[in-house]
Amino acid sequence: MTAPRRQRFFSWSMGLIACHLALSLSQASPALLPGVKPSSQQRLSVWGFDVYDARLWVRPGFSVASYSAHAFVLELSYLRSLEGEALSKRSIDEMRKVGAFSRDQENNWLKAMLDIFPNVQKGDRLQAVYAPNAGAEFFFNDKVIGRIQDPLFAQLFFGIWLHESTSAPAIRQAWIKGL
């Protein structure tokens, strides 16, 4: 293959890969919950380190203030590697800022998250589908990885980003303005 042909093939291949990625990213979450549309993407950075880009996929009429009344998808696109254990433990800490729960609930939820949440690498996506009064279903790179069928867990877990007591108020405010 001549150099110009290799370059054209490389450019064509990269374009095809970029199109595939764009399509898979834009179509994955709607497939998880039909009728949803993406909100603005928001970046979480901690101490100057980018952690993930967060996006809500919501149906018309969704309100951040009454998030627990609506089905929606939360999508986190990771920008760095993190251990599933760290994600699980941090989730419990953040959930405690949103609402109260017993030590037994904490132990049960932590065990469930430890079983579900994988170690993530840069480029991985964790998606969570909220079902009002039912619980949450989790996906890793578009594959089901588990469910926690506990309405209080789900309300507090998604409250990490959506409750007024969130430790990420800039993300919540941007979503309020963008919806």
Where are these regions (language model features)?
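Bacterial N-terminal signal peptides that target proteins for export
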Residues: 2-14
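Ser/Thr-centered flexible coil motifs
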Residues: 2-4, 24, 102
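Terminal leader/tail segments of proteins
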Residues: 27-140, 144-179
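Bacterial N-terminal signal peptides
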Residues: 12-24
